[in-house]
């Protein structure tokens, strides 16, 4: 046995989820050797694959898949239900989760015994079956990862008024935690260690980055924030909407020790592929003329679409950051319309100081909000990636 996941079916979503979990992958064919420690079913299996899955379970194997794919093993309810959230259960079979926004439909397993739906029905089956262990979900996690629709989502905070931002409809970071928790259950429940690669480089326990979207900030506001970076010794990444700073764009080329990326020329999304590409090209050209070669990109308003992704890939950026694709998650490669995009996504926590200010938070409440977010991320092993704007103030 090799500690890795076997995958039945080609799935960009599952491959990306398993990479984020730090789990190696091998493609599986019915009749092949069982050179894996857990089996993921990413599509409806054919008869030969179904027999293979049954034999694997009978030998004490561990299987994960949706109720739509594993209905011959675990009965599902006949009526499809809407699932806005998956609600965690302290002490349940799959732990370590927060509320998971999914906004999808699915078939609940009849024998579901853990996690809860919006109306507090059990949502997931996790337990013994046919001689082995299985985790059966009412949805396909790999398919959910590819959902790039955005919604206005509220974020937990201590004050009564919760901050909100338009972000990915599916909580993709939480989805990764769910898959990792399910894999841990399938391994530990069979007396097998759940070994995984660290998400952080060079043995680091965590990483931190500060993204600044300039959003028309004045030269003075940018200078004040740059001074804080230098005083604290924390470098920032500046995403510049070049047209707003045309009179003093060269100042960004003199930001030693900082990273400067592109936030388009105009701070707008045209919803027209040609115009959006031109907005990117024009901004990149303006920065080049000012002495800045931008290798990173962030779309205005955190917008993401397959057209924007193609434009980002075409421009040759090393990474981009759009919370309409993902927020509060590990870096990942997006995919849509049967295409996997080459530019790495680096998700951030999407609540900026300006959002808290609009909610009426005092400086003390703002500080407490970010302390709470940092503490939760450290406990859960999530990267500390935040974003702000020069004009929002409250830097003390």
Predicted regions and their residues:
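Catalytic beta-strand/loop cores that center a nucleophilic Ser/Cys/Thr
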Residues: 16-21, 84-149, 338, 343-346, ...
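Helical hinge/lid and interdomain linker segments adjacent to catalytic or ligand-binding clefts
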Residues: 2-75, 230
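Metal-dependent polysaccharide deacetylase catalytic core of the NodB/CE4 family, i.e.
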Residues: 205-208, 219-220, 227-310, 314-331, ...
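A glycine-rich, often tryptophan-bearing local segment used as a flexible ligand/cofactor-contacting loop or short
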Residues: 44-111, 117
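A short, acidic, amphipathic alpha-helical segment used as a generic capping/interface helix at domain edges
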Residues: 121, 125, 364-380
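A conserved mid-domain beta-alpha-beta active-site/ligand-binding segment of alpha/beta enzyme cores
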Residues: 115, 345-371
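C-terminal domain-boundary segment and adjacent tail
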Residues: 29, 182-202, 231-233, 237, ...
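Extracellular ligand-binding/catalytic regions of CAZymes and related secreted enzymes
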Residues: 141-202, 396
């Amino acid at each position: 046995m090799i500690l890795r996941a076997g995958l039945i079916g080609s799935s960009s979503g599952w491959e990306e989820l398993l990479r984020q979990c730090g789990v190696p992958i091998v493609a599986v064919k019915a009749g092949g050797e069982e050179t894996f420690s857990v089996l993921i079913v990413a599509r409806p299996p054919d008869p030969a694959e179904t027999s293979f899955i049954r034999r694997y379970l009978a030998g004490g194997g561990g299987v994960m898949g949706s109720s739509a794919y594993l209905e011959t093993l675990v009965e599902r309810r006949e009526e499809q239900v809407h699932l806005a959230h998956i609600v965690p259960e302290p002490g349940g079979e799959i732990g370590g989760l927060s509320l998971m926004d999914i906004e999808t439909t699915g078939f609940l397993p009849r024998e579901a015994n853990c996690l809860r739906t919006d109306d507090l029905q059990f949502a997931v089956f996790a337990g013994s079956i046919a001689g082995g262990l299985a985790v059966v979900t009412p949805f396909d996690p790999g398919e959910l990862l590819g959902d790039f629709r955005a919604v206005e989502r509220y974020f937990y905070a201590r004050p009564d008024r919760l901050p909100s931002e338009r972000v990915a409809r599916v909580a993709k970071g939480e989805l990764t935690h769910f898959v990792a928790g399910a894999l841990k259950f399938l391994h530990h429940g069979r007396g097998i260690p759940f070994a995984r690669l660290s998400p952080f480089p060079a043995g680091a326990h965590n990483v931190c980055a500060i993204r600044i979207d300039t959003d028309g900030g004045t030269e003075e506001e940018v200078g004040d924030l740059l001074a804080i970076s230098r005083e604290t010794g924390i470098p920032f990444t500046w995403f510049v909407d070049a047209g707003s700073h045309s009179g003093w764009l060269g100042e960004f080329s003199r930001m030693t020790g900082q990273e400067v990326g592109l936030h388009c020329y105009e701070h707008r999304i045209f919803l027209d592929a040609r115009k959006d590409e031109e907005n990117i090209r024009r901004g990149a050209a303006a920065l080049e003329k000012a002495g800045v070669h931008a290798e990173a990109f962030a779309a205005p308003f955190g917008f993401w679409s397959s057209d924007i992704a193609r434009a980002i890939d075409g421009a040759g950026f090393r990474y981009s950051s759009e919370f309409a694709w993902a927020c509060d998650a590990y870096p990942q490669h997006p995919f849509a319309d049967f295409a996997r995009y080459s530019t790495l996504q680096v998700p951030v926590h999407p609540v900026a100081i300006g959002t808290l200010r609009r909610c009426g938070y005092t400086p003390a409440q703002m500080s407490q909000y970010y302390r709470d977010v940092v503490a939760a991320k450290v406990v859960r092993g999530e990267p500390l990636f935040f974003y702000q704007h020069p004009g929002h103030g409250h830097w003390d």
